[in-house]
């Protein structure tokens, strides 16, 4: 369920601002989106796993706060990111 180092590296290479970027909002939102997608797939099989569902809601909230921060800081970067990730908003 956790992201492997290779998966993280691939996501950071695609969405990071530079090679070693792990802290930009774009990189963090992309990593959270991948984790959210993986957990959502897990919950489709294990419908009664309420502890994981609670953790999923926390991740969604964190992604929402980071998205709001990016939208307030630079709306063009925000729009480009949600287009690339295919997120609603």
Curated annotation (Swiss-Prot):
Top-level division of the source organism's lineage: Bacteria
One function term, GO molecular function aspect: structural constituent of ribosome
Any Pfam family matching the protein: Ribosomal_S15
Alphabetized UniProt keyword annotations: Ribonucleoprotein, Ribosomal protein, RNA-binding, rRNA-binding
One Gene Ontology biological process: translation
One GO CC annotation: cytosolic small ribosomal subunit
Function: One of the primary rRNA binding proteins, it binds directly to 16S rRNA where it helps nucleate assembly of the platform of the 30S subunit by binding and bridging several RNA helices of the 16S rRNA. Forms an intersubunit bridge (bridge B4) with the 23S rRNA of the 50S subunit in the ribosome.
PANTHER family reported in the protein's UniProt record: RIBOSOMAL PROTEIN S15, BACTERIAL AND ORGANELLAR, SMALL RIBOSOMAL SUBUNIT PROTEIN US15M
Homology family: Belongs to the universal ribosomal protein uS15 family.
HAMAP family xref list: Ribosomal_uS15_B
Subunit structure: Part of the 30S ribosomal subunit. Forms a bridge to the 50S subunit in the 70S ribosome, contacting the 23S rRNA.
Name the UniProt record assigns to this protein: Small ribosomal subunit protein uS15
Naturally occurring in which organism (per UniProt): Nocardia farcinica (strain IFM 10152)
